[in-house]
Amino acid sequence: MSKSQQNNWAQYRPEQTQGGAGEISAIVSGIVSRIQTVTLVRVVKTKSGGLAPVGLVDVQPLVAQISGDGTVTPHGIIYNVPYFRLQGGGNAVIIDPEPGDIGMCGFCSRDISSVKQNKAPSAPQSRRRFDYSDGLYFGGFLNGTPKQYIHFKDGGIKLFSPGDIEMEAANIRLNAQGGVSSTSQTFQANTKTTAKFTGGGGISSDGDVKAKDVSLLDHPHSGVQSGNDQSGKPVAT
């Protein structure tokens, strides 16, 4: 008996080699073993991403294959798997997978090659079913501590990044029932036209305030005369 035949026999339990119900069970098990459902995978490569249409990833299943004689063999790479993005119409949260991420890969019941190309209803290119070639990636499972995040917790929401946070819109409004505060070392507002601050409580400063080149704390006046006359306007120092 050849080694391959020995391996085939090793895949079956003794009761499955004696005919009858055991043989039927072996046949069903063989069919089911060829059906891919979902499995954990690690991202090997990300293609596209950022402010672009949803891209693809190359992934490797984490649960190894076992032959009939017990030999453990790592899975190969599954290429060009579409990944999930939280998106509705033109609105999206862009968090692209990165190499090393662990996620779930689900496998479709039919060949989705044409749909991936056309992004429209299409006929299957083959009769394959539940195949590794028709996977979809959903991240992230079993991953480490994030470095930047949005944390929804009791009492509020925390947005954190060790880098810069940029907001860009036609208009940005901050509506706070209490107040808006900043503990940063500097606060700078550069407007192209008009900067306006209004409020019933007034504006206070622990340091100097300048209007163009005129200091509020230390400025001379033009046209100063003695007596009851008023001085001229403040001038820059």
Language-model features, listed with the residues they occupy:
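Intrinsic-disorder/coil detector with helix-boundary
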Residues: 2-5, 13-16, 170-237
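Hydrophobic packing positions characteristic
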Residues: 2-178
